Amino acid sequence: LTGEVQIGKTRWLESLVTELADCGVSCVGVLAPGQWVPSEGEHADANGFEKLGIDNVLLPSGERIPFARRGDLARADGPFDEESRAAKAELAWHIDDAAIDRVNAHFDEITAHASAAAPVGAKPHSERSAEGAESKDPSRAPGLLIVDELGRLEIWRGGGLTSAMA
């Protein structure tokens, strides 16, 4: 899913995760909802809201991790780390290295679980037929991996959520 900044990609994904759960389809991965407050300041959007930061919500557990804070706010509040990966990449957002590590560990857990659940000799998804789609075997149950979002740190710097791209 791609699109311009602030057009509702994460809100759409949140709705999709809910709809799929209602249909019995599990979603794993990460959602990245913004931390928004009403504002009339210079950083307010056209709807009168200001984005202060970004959380990461780990799926399926729903664990919420404070992930990123707008750089100017992080500098003013004090948690900005000049040695962090995000600072070295000169991003507009301050992302705590521990938060990156936690989300990467989550994707590593997803990969390990998927590898353990795959039957020996299983064909890649692209080579499977629809046969067995109704199987009660959890390793064959439908599911969706959500990675919200990949940005400059991942795509141009080879950092950030590297486990999501593995």
Pin down the residues of each PLM region.
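Intrinsic disorder/low-complexity segments
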Residues: A44, A112-A141
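Conserved TIR/SEFIR loop-to-helix hotspot centered on a Trp-containing motif
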Residues: G159
